[in-house]
Regions:
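N-terminal targeting signals for export/organelle localization
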Residues: 1-8, 123
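Non-catalytic, surface beta->alpha helical segment in thiol-disulfide oxidoreductase systems
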Residues: 79-122
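Short cysteine clusters
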Residues: 39-42
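A short beta-strand-turn-helix
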Residues: 9-29, 70
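Conserved beta-strand elements of beta-rich interaction domains across eukaryotes
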Residues: 15, 36-37, 68, 89-91, ...
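Chalcogenol-based redox active-site neighborhoods
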Residues: 2-5, 30, 52, 58-62, ...
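Thiol-based oxidoreductase modules, predominantly thioredoxin-like and allied folds used
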Residues: 10-12, 34, 45-71, 78
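Acidic, Ser/Thr-rich intrinsically disordered and amphipathic helical segments
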Residues: 15, 44, 103-106
Length: 123
């Protein structure tokens, strides 16, 4: 898998599917940032998302440009950017729409703890 502590840019549906599958097999939380190059709030939140990735190496952070990989955005019904989709065991468990750095940070911390606890108890 890619480097821990980094945001992984997705450029193909196959990349996304592979990383989600690997993350699910490892019992990891996956956070997907649906973004667009022309979106000012997306540019605002990008460095914060990157810092969250560095601070939460047990979580997989993916970035999907909705104009580049439309199929993934359509699959998840994304129609506003940024949208953050939280996945666990191939299921969406939470969604945040908008560049709310406090809400994003709190939810990543909460769900990362929960994912780590469930991975430990099932090991």
């Amino acid at each position: 898998m890619a480097e821990e502590g980094q945001v992984i840019g997705i450029h193909k549906v196959e990349e996304f599917d592979t990383l989600v599958k690997l993350g699910n097999e490892a019992g990891k939380l996956i956070v997907v940032d649906f973004t667009a190059s022309w979106c000012p709030p997306c540019r605002f939140i990008a460095p914060i998302f990157a810092e969250l990735a560095k601070a939460n190496v047990n979580v997989i952070f993916l970035k999907v440009d909705v104009d580049e990989v439309k199929e993934i955005a359509e699959k998840y019904g994304v129609n506003a950017m940024p949208t953050f989709v939280f996945l666990k065991d191939e299921n969406e468990i939470h969604r945040i729409v908008g560049a709310d750095k406090v809400q994003l940070g709190n939810k990543v911390a909460e769900l990362a703890r929960s994912a780590a606890a469930s991975a430990t108890s099932s090991a």
